[in-house]
Amino acid sequence: VKPSGYFTTVYNADGSQELEKFVTSGSNRIYKTINEIPEDLQDAFVAIEDERFYKHNGIDLQGILRAGLVGITSGDFSEGASTITQQLIKNNVFPNFSQEKTFLDSVERKIQEQFLALELEKQMSKEEILENYMNTINLGQNTLGVQSAAKRYFNKDVSELSLSECTVIAGITQNPTRYDPVNNPDRKS
């Protein structure tokens, strides 16, 4: 589940930056290790995306029950229950999930994600899972990963982000189009 497709920068002979090019079509990713990512940003992602991340084994039964109850009582089954581990798998194993045609297709994928999440948690540490997730997450405008987001939205290295900048980047995951701080500056999460 390691991310693929990295961001490449081309330099002139004098060392100045010439242009940016993508190795993989549509990719915009600069990999950072977990030690290079601020703890505030890690904590913000966990708080927003999967508050029980350090307590579950890849699936969050409490979250699944909550989402199911909300779906049954409201008729709206859009409530999220995917863990960070499941989202990592979805981003890397099921990249075409948005093209699912039926609710049944979505349920089938979710079951596969849950099985794979349980298996992945046996093979990788929580830190490895979080590191890979933070390097694959779509943060708007096909900006993949936290380093690319730090560069795009704040023109700085991820390690230099302030607490408020960390919360803006983590908040983008809730709705990457709506909370894009470039196109919607008044809606910063």
Question: What do the predicted segments below correspond to?
Answer:
Residues 1-5:
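Aromatic-capped interface at the extracytoplasmic side
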